[in-house]
């Protein structure tokens, strides 16, 4: 059969099949016999699946299927990918996003919003829970974690005040209200903890100073007129600067004498133009310096509090 086809040549075949009888690239004539049916059978079967070629010896050659170039089943209709995206967006709308995304508010801000939404500006703990879970679906999933945070913020934040129930008001649990001084601190979802007042902080500092010193420290003298003129004038004269510094030195000497924390003789060294003494005159002789440290390091370390405060650099103006 193969010899008959070769003798006839291309004239015996129809014009449409002349080019189709060419062997596919990568195949020898011996391989065509393994198909079963000769070359005419291969020519008359254009839709032959590539499975028969893969069963032959050698690696599978590059084979172009007859349907090459046609839209495959995986591509789908035009715009199929966009349709899938739209379907996904339709399932997750605004309400679905609220359930998945945590609101950008702190727990203190949530409590403040709940209290401000009440007609009487006061709510119980359970009512605050209901407001948070009703307006923010994200908190409906796990209630244990954020409810504990709500309780901690109510007890630790000074801006939330506990109000007891009236006698004619049935129910259990106290009310929580917002301090009027803290209403201005709530802005755009940010709610900061209330800081201590300056008067309370200064009173705490004064009480701590009394407990450390054993007695009330003498108050510093008010600045004299020469000091005020010194601040106003750009280039003060030498006598005015000396008067201002002598007043400051006398106030520091009085403070050192009242507290009794400075070594003897150190308070008298605050005169103008004198440096504090070295550690060699005040340090105990029983202390042994550690190896590798010279006495000069101890002198610099001990005189840091006052010498570096008053004489930070040689030639610095006071």
UniProtKB/Swiss-Prot annotation:
The gene is FOXI2. GO terms for molecular function: DNA-binding transcription factor activity, RNA polymerase II-specific; RNA polymerase II cis-regulatory region sequence-specific DNA binding. Keywords: Activator, DNA-binding, Nucleus, Transcription, Transcription regulation. One of its GO terms (cellular component) is nucleus. It holds the Pfam family Forkhead. One of its GO terms (biological process) is anatomical structure morphogenesis. It comes from Homo sapiens. This is Forkhead box protein I2. PANTHER family: FORKHEAD BOX PROTEIN (PTHR11829), FORKHEAD BOX PROTEIN I2 (PTHR11829:SF372).
């Amino acid at each position: 059969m193969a010899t008959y086809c070769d003798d006839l040549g291309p004239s015996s075949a129809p014009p449409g099949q002349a080019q189709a009888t060419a062997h596919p690239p990568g195949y020898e004539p011996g391989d065509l016999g393994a198909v079963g049916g000769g070359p005419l059978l291969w020519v008359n079967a254009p839709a032959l699946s590539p499975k028969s070629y893969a069963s032959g010896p050698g690696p599978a050659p590059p084979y172009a299927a007859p349907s090459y170039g046609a839209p495959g089943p995986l591509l789908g209709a035009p715009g199929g990918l966009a349709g899938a995206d739209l379907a996904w967006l339709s399932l997750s709308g605004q309400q679905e996003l609220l359930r998945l995304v945590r609101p950008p508010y702190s727990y203190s801000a949530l409590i403040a919003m709940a209290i401000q939404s009440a007609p009487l500006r006061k709510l119980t703990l359970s009512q605050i829970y209901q407001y948070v879970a009703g307006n923010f679906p994200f908190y409906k999933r796990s209630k244990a974690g954020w409810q504990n945070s709500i309780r901690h913020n109510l007890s630790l934040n000074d801006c939330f005040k506990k109000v007891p129930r009236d006698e004619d008001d049935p129910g259990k649990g106290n009310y929580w209200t917002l301090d009027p001084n803290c209403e201005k601190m709530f802005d755009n979802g940010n709610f900061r903890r209330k800081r201590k007042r300056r008067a309370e902080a200064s009173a705490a500092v004064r009480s701590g100073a009394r407990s450390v010193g054993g007695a009330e420290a003498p108050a510093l003298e008010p600045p004299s007129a020469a000091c005020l003129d010194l601040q106003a004038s750009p280039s003060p004269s030498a006598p005015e600067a000396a008067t201002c510094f002598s007043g400051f030195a006398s106030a520091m000497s009085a403070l050192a004498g009242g507290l009794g924390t400075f070594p003897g003789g150190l308070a008298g060294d605050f005169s103008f133009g004198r440096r504090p003494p070295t550690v060699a005159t005040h340090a105990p002789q029983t202390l042994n310096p550690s190896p590798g440290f010279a006495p000069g390091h101890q002198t610099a370390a001990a005189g840091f509090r006052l010498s570096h405060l008053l004489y930070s650099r040689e030639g610095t103006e006071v």
